[in-house]
Amino acid sequence: MVFASLEHILTHISFSVVSILISIHLITLLFVKEIIGLSDSSKKGMIITFFCITGLLVTRWVFSGHLPFSDLYESLIFLSWTFSIFYMVPYFKKSKNYYLNTIITPSVIFTQGFATSGLLTKMHESLILVPALQSHWLMMHVSMMILGYATLLCGSLLSVAILVITFQELIQIIGKSKNFYFLNESFSFAEIKYMNMTDKNNVLQKTSFLSYRNYYRSQFLQQLDRWGYRTISLGFIFLTIGIISGAVWANEAWGSYWNWDPKETWAFITWTIFAIYLHTRKNKKLEDLNSSIVASIGFLIIWVCYLGINLLGIGLHSYGSFTPN
């Protein structure tokens, strides 16, 4: 009874804090660029959310007697906790990683918000594990898969950001090209010496400004691309270990390493997509933009694999889904 009450309290605290964080991010996004007070409140809220989720997982573990990996609700809680870990590690190391934190914070907010919302109320109660899940492989397989999903989602979102910035800049350049002398086909820098001093200064200032913007944009995109590559590489390792451990577990439980179950099929598709991403990074003939497109596709594939199959409740991996077996 005590554990159930504590779990209930932690769930409501985390949901309340997440709701406040959503409001803070919406205010920052829609009305103001940056307010120090709101930024500090967001950081403190993330810390509170992290400890609430940690306490929730530990309480559920002690109360149920098994690792909290048995259904969609518990895996979502663990997923949001994994996102929080990626946020907290740089925080405790006193090292700032603005790019990852910008991606991680909304991920924690919406994952935890969905998990603790009324949509999954029926799954909030801890239940006894079904026989197929009563295995020591549960921790190895599920934890590696969730770590892989979380890491790959963070890296994929960085790639999505690269595409958004690239195409946004492309649209702006096309729209404003007529306003710049040096973007006009009839203009050449040799004509500067025939201009008066005012026009000459205007052209040079615009040229300098555009060069600075291009340099800053290039550096920014390179940093996003570098962190995206590192994050996806780590997530690919987690995903590979998770798939292999799952195959070993399947052989023990069902007598076959691979059954082409919907979850297994989409896990293989996810693995293939990110294998292609890593291949494009190693191939110098392929541009970085192409790898970002592949990673962005992978972002959608992960959600189909992780959430879509569970919501449909089909196949051997439908434990704890909306649709009963």
UniProtKB/Swiss-Prot annotation:
Kindly indicate whether the keyword Zinc belongs to this entry: no
Q: Which residues cross the membrane?
A: 12-32, 45-65, 72-92, 100-120, 145-165, 231-251, 264-281, 293-313
* Gene Ontology CC: one annotated term: chloroplast thylakoid membrane
Q: Which biological process annotations from GO are given for this protein? A: cytochrome complex assembly
Tell me if Zinc is a UniProt keyword of this record: no
Q: Which GO terms describe its molecular function?
A: heme binding
Q: Which residues form a coiled coil?
A: none
UniProt cross-references to Pfam families, sorted A to Z: Cytochrom_C_asm
Q: Where in the cell is it found?
A: Plastid, Chloroplast thylakoid membrane
According to Swiss-Prot or TrEMBL, what is its membrane topology?
A: Multi-pass membrane protein
- The entry's keywords: Chloroplast, Cytochrome c-type biogenesis, Membrane, Plastid, Thylakoid, Transmembrane, Transmembrane helix
InterPro entries given in the database record:
Cyt_c_assembly, Cyt_c_biogenesis_CcsA, Cyt_c_biogenesis_CcsA/CcmC
Predominant place of localization? plastid
Q: Which HAMAP family match?
A: CytC_CcsA
**Entry function:** Required during biogenesis of c-type cytochromes (cytochrome c6 and cytochrome f) at the step of heme attachment.
Description of how the protein assembles with itself and partners: May interact with Ccs1.
Q: Per the similarity annotation, which family is this?
A: Belongs to the CcmF/CycK/Ccl1/NrfE/CcsA family.
Task: Report what the protein is called.
Answer: Cytochrome c biogenesis protein CcsA
- Which source organism does the UniProt entry give? Glycine max
